[in-house]
Curated annotation (Swiss-Prot):
Start and end residues of each C2 B9-type domain: 9-127
Keyword Cytoplasm belongs to the record: yes
Protein name per the record: B9 domain-containing protein 1
Domain of life: Eukaryota
Cellular localisation: Cytoplasm, Cytoskeleton, Cilium basal body
């Protein structure tokens, strides 16, 4: 008797939120979560996490190193809604309040293999000088009530943002049964791991 053909494929993601560069800030931590379509479902691992607080390195790079692990497996019947990882970086202001220092998002790489991505980060801005001063004085900076909005297009065109900082991610991607369902993800890709990485996932 022939084996039944698979009805779903699997996407396995491991890796780490490696490091960040925020020249103006120190003592930062990072939160991550995954955003995906309605046909996707997590089957193992963690969809979200929060790192430890990292301080800048003492060398010329002044990197904030987290090396925070990512490990999650998804199943789906079609590629629509391919998972994105959303990052939110937080740190103290001059009054000791935790405020957002950057948002960013990038799709999980499509091809199996080891990948490196550098994500430009951004923060929402107040629309007037008075609002900027009030938010600074009260310690309540503009931020999204749900960081997952960063991975979506709706309403983004009316949001005023400012770029600041970069976060570097390492992905190890494994797929299962995609070819059996007729999807070709191409050859194993290691682009950006051996050589210098370029910013990916610019805010729209």
């Amino acid at each position: 008797m022939a084996a039944a053909s698979p009805s779903v494929f699997l996407l396995m993601i491991t890796g780490q939120v490696e490091s960040a560069q925020f020249p103006e800030y120190d003592d930062l931590y990072c939160k991550y979560c995954f955003v995906y379509g309605q046909d996707w479902a997590p089957t193992a691992g963690l969809e979200e996490g929060i790192s430890q607080i990292a301080s800048k390195s003492q060398d010329v790079r002044q990197a904030l190193v987290w090396n925070f692990p990512i490990d999650v497996t998804f199943k789906s019947t079609n590629p629509y809604g391919w998972p994105q990882i959303v990052l939110s970086v937080y740190g103290p202001d001059v009054f000791g309040n935790d405020v957002v220092r950057g948002y960013g998002a990038v799709h999980v790489p499509l091809s199996p293999g080891r990948h490196k991505r550098t994500i430009p980060m951004f923060v929402p801005e107040s629309t007037s000088t008075l609002q900027k001063f009030t938010s600074w004085f009260m310690g309540r900076r503009p931020e999204y009530t749900d960081p997952k909005v960063v991975a979506q297009g709706e309403g983004r065109e009316v949001t005023r943002v400012r770029s600041q900082g970069f976060v570097t991610l390492l992905f190890n991607v494994v797929t299962k049964d995609m070819k059996k369902l007729g999807y070709d993800t191409g050859p194993v890709d290691t682009q950006g791991v051996l050589g210098p990485s370029l910013p990916q996932g610019n805010p729209q």
